[in-house]
């Protein structure tokens, strides 16, 4: 047989598949060719982006991309167009073209750029000159504008800016938020646009600023504008007193003042000025216990009064209350604007009812905020008075302890006396500043409380007179400390005479004619039933400590010997000597007085025989309404022959 041709040999054999080692390179080549022909830009969605959100992106000279709603991957334009997506109006048109089923109404540029891999710009080859790019996409948003809800982590602050005369892009508003946070030493945590005025144009921005990760404790950011800083949970700020006097509520409320500590006791011993041991307690508690702690200033002020200083707590609560009010008003205004845009086709009566509904919501909101303000002020006033009383009580206790030393040391007594006088002067300043504030916001109310304020200042001076009268028990010590005491009293003396000078427009001529306000609605002041019973008064006296009994006596007693005499209290020291009574008239008056006295004694003896257990009055005692509470206590104590145990203790000492 002759040799057969290759065709004949091929026809005689069956076809066999190529070996397996040849299939693997062929499949890889086919896959690479498909990727090159399709020219896909594989951009993995970032963690911050939802997989199915409608977005578009484009760079000049490269294929325009859009995001697939099902897979979340970036796909090239089906028509292989190359658009420069710079104008928001053109971006809106392209979004409507790529997502016709979503009814796109607006676009918004993303806050940060995202990476794009293998964006090769339509090349048929499998290689890219620049395989990686970063582009800022545009969000294609359907429906009306709704502001993004921002989360405020613990230690961060929520702020916002509105500029009705400027219509800027979202990128510019985002930059403004970053600059505002950076100016306070914070970093931007999140931002959202407010008040749209066009396609990707807005009149405001809301943002959240947080402390840097390297410094998680926000107490180091005390410097700066108090309206945007994170408030610490301890310590006091310098100069806070002036801030509180300026930043008062707009409505006439009774604001109170807590003075930040000043360098008043530089001469005191170092061990007496030790810092409180509980300054770092809140930090330790927050780390150990998993219970969430309130971050709002109002909740912290009402819920944890010991965690923060009174002055800082009141300022922070007042500021956070106003911020909360602004957030709630902005939310209501957004809902009102959305409802108004949706009700354009409704009848006029329905639209008017809708407006009245939102107006009632705003009015209710203002009433709630006003109630919170009043509650905040009342709580602050109560705590201020308690702080002042505690400071004065502690200072008085130290002064009594220094006097009871054996022998009393002049330096220690002077130091304790200085602390006590400063506590009393602080109460005087607080009373005057409160009166000045009320006179500025409500002159009528200030005129009504004028008599009470002057009486309170007189009581403070009487209390100082009685306390300094204790020095008479040691004449040598009183003579030695007399010059220093005079300097302390004259250095910063605030008495009833300062009341006229504290309010502009007041005259000193009205001081003598000052009368208590007449009010028909005020009920007559009555003493409690137990005040007339000797047994109940003695039992109540046993429950009091010697210091409390002394304070009651000092608050209601007349001045004794004291080197400082106020001209506003002791007005009758120089009696006129030009008046006199004839001898005949004097003898007649003495005879009539003796006869009347004998009748009174006889009547008392008869009544005592009828009532061997004494008189116990269970009725209402008529009290002169001109008397203050301290003067009423003075009369009642003098009726029962009350003696100060402190005086007796000092007099019976050897």
UniProtKB/Swiss-Prot annotation:
Transmembrane keyword on record: yes
Motif (Basolateral sorting signal): 608-619
Known partners and oligomeric status: Monomer and homodimer. Heparin binding promotes homodimerization. Binds, via its C-terminus, to the PID domain of several cytoplasmic proteins, including APBB and APBA family members, MAPK8IP1 and DAB1. Binding to Dab1 inhibits its serine phosphorylation. Interacts with CPEB1. Interacts (via NPXY motif) with DAB2 (via PID domain); the interaction is impaired by tyrosine phosphorylation of the NPXY motif. Interacts (via NPXY motif) with DAB1.
Residue ranges, annotated region (Interaction with DAB1): 636-652
Note: Binds zinc and copper in the extracellular domain. Zinc-binding increases heparin binding. No Cu(2+) reducing activity with copper-binding.
Regions of this protein lying in the Cytoplasmic compartment: 608-654
Motif position, NPXY motif: 644-647
Residue ranges with Acidic residues bias: 262-272
Protein name stated in the entry: Amyloid beta precursor like protein 1
Binding site for Zn(2+) 2: 565
Swiss-Prot/TrEMBL domain comment: The NPXY sequence motif found in many tyrosine-phosphorylated proteins is required for the specific binding of the PID domain. However, additional amino acids either N- or C-terminal to the NPXY motif are often required for complete interaction. The NPXY site is also involved in clathrin-mediated endocytosis.
Region: CuBD subdomain, residue numbers: 154-212
Residues holding Zn(2+) 1: 206, 209-210
Entry's localization field: Cell membrane
Primary site of residence: membrane
Segment forming the signal sequence: 1-38
């Amino acid at each position: 047989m002759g040799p057969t041709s290759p065709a004949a040999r091929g026809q005689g054999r069956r076809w066999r598949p190529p070996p397996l080692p040849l299939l693997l390179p062929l499949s890889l080549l086919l896959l690479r060719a498909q990727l090159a022909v399709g020219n896909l830009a594989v951009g993995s969605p970032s963690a911050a982006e939802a997989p199915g959100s409608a977005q578009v992106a484009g760079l000049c000279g490269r294929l325009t991309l859009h995001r697939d709603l099902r897979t979340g991957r970036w796909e090239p334009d089906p028509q292989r167009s190359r658009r420069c997506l710079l104008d928001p109006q053109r971006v809106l048109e392209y979004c409507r073209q790529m997502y016709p089923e979503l009814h796109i109404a607006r676009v918004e540029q993303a806050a940060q750029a995202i990476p794009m891999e293998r964006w090769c710009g339509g090349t048929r080859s499998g290689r890219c000159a620049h395989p990686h790019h970063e582009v800022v996409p545009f969000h294609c948003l359907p429906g009306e504008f709704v502001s993004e809800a921002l989360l405020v982590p613990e230690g961060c602050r929520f702020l916002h800016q509105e500029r009705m005369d400027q219509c800027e892009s979202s990128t510019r508003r985002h930059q403004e938020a970053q600059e505002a946070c950076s100016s306070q030493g914070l970093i931007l945590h999140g931002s959202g646009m407010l008040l749209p005025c066009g396609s990707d144009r807005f009149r405001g921005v809301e943002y959240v600023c947080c402390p840097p990760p390297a410094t998680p404790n926000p107490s180091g950011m005390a410097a700066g504008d108090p309206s945007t800083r994170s408030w610490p949970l301890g310590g006091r700020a310098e100069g806070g007193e002036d801030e509180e006097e300026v930043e008062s509520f707009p409505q006439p409320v009774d604001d109170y003042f807590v003075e930040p500590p000043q360098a008043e006791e530089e001469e005191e011993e170092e061990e007496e000025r030790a810092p409180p041991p509980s300054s770092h307690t809140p930090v330790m508690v927050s780390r150990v216990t998993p219970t969430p702690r309130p971050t709002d200033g109002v909740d912290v002020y009402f819920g944890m009064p010991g965690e923060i200083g009174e002055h800082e707590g009141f300022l922070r609560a007042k500021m956070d209350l106003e911020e909360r009010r602004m957030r709630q008003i902005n939310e209501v205004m957004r809902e009102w604007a959305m409802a108004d845009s949706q009700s354009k086709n409704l009848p006029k009566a329905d639209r008017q009812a809708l407006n009245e509904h939102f107006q009632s919501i705003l009015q209710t909101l203002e009433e709630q905020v006003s109630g919170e303000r009043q509650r905040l002020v009342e709580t602050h006033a109560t705590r201020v008075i308690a702080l002042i009383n505690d400071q004065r009580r502690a200072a008085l206790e130290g002064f009594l302890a220094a006097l009871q030393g054996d022998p009393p040391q002049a330096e220690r007594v002077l130091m304790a006396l200085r602390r006590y006088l400063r506590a009393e002067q602080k109460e005087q300043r607080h009373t005057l500043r409160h009166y000045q504030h009320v006179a500025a916001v409500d002159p009528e109310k200030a005129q009504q409380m004028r008599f009470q304020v002057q009486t309170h200042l007189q009581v403070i001076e009487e209390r100082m007179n009685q306390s300094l009268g204790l020095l008479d028990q040691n004449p040598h010590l009183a003579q030695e400390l007399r010059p220093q005491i005079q300097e302390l009293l004259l250095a910063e003396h605030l008495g009833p005479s300062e009341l006229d000078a504290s309010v502009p427009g007041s005259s000193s001529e009205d001081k003598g004619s000052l009368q208590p306000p007449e009010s028909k609605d005020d009920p007559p002041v009555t003493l409690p039933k137990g005040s007339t019973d000797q047994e109940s008064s003695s039992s109540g006296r046993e429950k009091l400590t010697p210091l409390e009994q002394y304070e009651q006596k000092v608050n209601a007693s007349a001045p004794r010997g004291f080197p400082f005499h106020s001209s506003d209290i002791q007005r009758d020291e120089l009696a006129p000597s030009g008046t006199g009574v004839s001898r005949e008239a004097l003898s007649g008056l003495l005879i009539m007085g003796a006869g009347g006295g004998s009748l009174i004694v006889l009547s008392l003896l008869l009544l005592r025989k009828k009532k061997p257990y004494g008189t116990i009055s269970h009725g209402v005692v008529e009290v002169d309404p001109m008397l203050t509470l301290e003067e009423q206590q003075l009369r009642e104590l003098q009726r029962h022959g009350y003696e100060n145990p402190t005086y007796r203790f000092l007099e019976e000492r050897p």
